[in-house]
Structures are given as structure tokens and as C-alpha cells.
């Protein structure tokens, strides 16, 4: 197994078992440049490893390495993923530094200069804190110092956009539930499946989404929540809300102070932002590269570059930075950072985003006026990666939720949904919502997190990262986040509104199977 192959989630690696390495054979046809030469030639490997073509007259010609783009991989059904070296050309430290350096060189040309925003995930924050044996707050403050040295403008927290994702997911679930059980009673006579049926499957994990699109296609896609992940919601907020409401205002205020009336020419566009996220998982690079998150008008992606937690360590080495010796910068962007006045992080229970717990409590209140204030008592499956919880009223099960992490549990969920549909089982035996994550133990154990070469040490590292995730936090419900509510009121016209559905929701696409002779093993 190559060094990079364990970076992606297990569901992105095909085989019959949980952990599967990606195939080394890519079936994507490569466009071959036609040559006018009709003579015979042979291919030879040079001492330095280069492949050369030798013609009949002895002339040597170096052969170019066949390459495919990340978008090629996403649009191809030949495999679930490909090797890391194939996938990530524009999602690397070198690309990040190239953009940062180019931006610094454009200081004298304001038309070319971009505002650089970095969004940090709480899982990456916890992993770095565990690795350096410091607090998560110190991690943030030292990162702030480090990024200032690179002339990065802003450091944001993806927990902020997670609150939007939770609220939209919960409202979407309630709408589906009402349509299925209350309004139409699921149209039992015709057996017609609702356009957005139950169970609703969570959508925050890009590894799971990619797997669903390529292996189960049209059957499973209607069940998946249309709500964007926290990463992509932050991409929308940064490129559109932040640009329009904050940066534009600041620019116009500066122009007014300078008696410059040419404000229209100084309007900041989404393409003037370079947005980088730091995530626990390499699959997030796939997500950011989806065409659904590219704006043709402004020619920009919502998230321009994704760096994993481990790549931040590589970045420190590249810049010859002793992270622990960095001073701690106390200036934190209040609106887009989940930090209380007492310097504690606002959080919600669950190191993978807390979708099951939040939606379960939200639905119980909205649908049945039941307040769940006590800790949820889960029924544990064969391991901690599969949990169930249900709500009963007058002896009837009215909500049935599950959490499924890891490939095997995901397969079991998909099989159960298929069985329930084909056999038309009693709805009481079905799930209403399932929180799905590709990685065992969820996002805190993502393939991009900092791990040890000694496998036996990784369990302790995982436990410590989990502790760091819950260190120095205040649990707060997303609905109590006043900054989130302000954006809903001033920009989105409310939760799950038409504007919210336009900006905070997405769609999925069945990837057609292709037949290619290169895929045949003789």
C-alpha cells in the first residue's frame, strides 16, 4: 500500500471488506496525440526512470506521463476513487503557497490582489492540539500568528457554517416527515415513492456521497439530504455573503473616506476571494471540486483549496516554522468564529457534527411537542459505530433514528432501505433518519488527521483528539446563534426559505457505468 492510499475514507476504496485500497488501474481513456510517423519504434526505460520512444533512426523522444484531472475522476464510474497522486493537483500545499506568493507579489496591482480566507474545522483543531499537546485555543491563536506571516487576511471556524447545516437539515427532515406521514400518508394505494422520501440520509460526508452516486445511483439519491455540508455552506457564505455584506461595505467606507466616488469599479467579486479550508478528510478535496460548487459567471469555486490536517504539519516544515514557539494572536473574527466572551468554543455534542442528536431533538419538538432534555440513551449495535434511538408516544414508535459509520454499516443501511422498499414492510420497522459517515469513529478519525506510523498508538491518539474536541467548549444550540439568525434574517429570508434552498442546498448525480476494454483483466 502506498503512503497516500489510506488517506481517503474506506467507502472510497472498493473491495468486499471495510478497508480497501484504490485500484492502481485507471480505465479513463487518455487522449493520444496523433503522430505523422508511420515507422516502427520501441519504448525504453532510461536509467533515471524516464520512458523514451526510440525511432528506427535512433532518435529518442521522451514520453509524457498520462494524467487525468480531479473532475475526470469524479465523472468516471470506472472506480470509486484513484490514487492520491492522480487526484490532487490543485489541492496541495504547493498550489496553496503558489497562490499566496502570487498574491503577495501583486501588492502594487489591486486588481489582481485577492482577499485570502482560511476556514478551520474543529476536528483539525483538535488533532493539532493533540499532536502538539496544547489547548485548542492555543492552536487557533498560533495559527492566526502563522497565517498572518503569510499575509492571510482571515481565519474562520467551520463550526459557524455547521450551525446552518444542522438547522437546514432539521427543517428539511421535518418537511419530509410531514409530507410522508402526515400530509399524504405515503400514498399506500399506489405505492408511489415521494420525491424526497424517508429515511433521510445525512449529506455532510463527501466520501459517502461519492460512493452513493457511483454505486447506487438513482435508487439511493432521493433519500439523501439536499443540505450542503458545513464546508460548502462556508464556501457560499465566504464567497457571497461575506463579499457582499462585509468586504464591500469596508471597501465603500474606505472609498468614501478617500472622497473616491468610483465605488462601482471597486466592488469586490467572489472571484476576488481565495478560500482555503483545513479539513480532517481528503474526501473534502473531492467535494470542493464538484461542478455544483463552481460559479460559471464569476469563474470561481466556493472553496478554492482544501488542505488536510496532516498537510498543515507539512506546511510548517516547508516554511521552517516551529509551531510551539509562535506567539499567540488574540484577534479573532467574532462573527465567523464560534468563540464565547470567556474564550470558550461554542459547540454541539458529536465530533462528526451532531446531526443525529440535533435533528432528533428538533423533530421531537416540532412534530410532537416533546422536549428532550436528558442525554439520549442509544441502543448500541455490534460496535460504537452503529447506534439507534427511537421516540415512542402512547406505545407507538413515531421517530426511529440511526447512526452508521464505516463501510459495512453503510452497506447494511442501504440493504435495509432496499428491502423495505421492495417488500413494502410496515413503516414502523424503517428508519426515519440516518447519520452516515464513511470513516469508522466519524470525522475525528478522518484520513487527513494526524496519526502515528505505529498503528497500535492510533487508538490513543483518537481518544485524545476526541477529548481535545470537547475541551474548553460551551454547548449551544444552533438556533441560539445570533450571528446565524442575523444572516437568516438579512440575507436568506429565514431557515429553509426559497433563498436558503438556493444558497444552502445542492443536488446529486447518478454516475453512469461505462464499459471500456481497458477495464477487462485478461
UniProtKB/Swiss-Prot annotation:
It comes from the Eukaryota. InterPro entries: Cytosolic_Fe-S_CAF, Fe_hydrogenase, Fe_hydrogenase_lsu_C, Fe_hydrogenase_ssu. One of its GO terms (molecular function) is metal ion binding. One of its GO terms (cellular component) is cytosolic [4Fe-4S] assembly targeting complex. It holds the Pfam family Fe_hyd_lg_C. Keywords: 4Fe-4S, Iron, Iron-sulfur, Metal-binding. [4Fe-4S] cluster 1 binds at residues 26, 73, 76, 79. [4Fe-4S] cluster 2 binds at residues 205, 281, 439, 443. Component of the cytosolic iron-sulfur (Fe/S) protein assembly machinery. Required for maturation of extramitochondrial Fe/S proteins. Belongs to the NARF family. This is Probable cytosolic Fe-S cluster assembly factor narfl. It comes from Dictyostelium discoideum (Social amoeba). The lineage of its organism: Eukaryota, Amoebozoa, Evosea, Eumycetozoa, Dictyostelia. The gene is narfl.
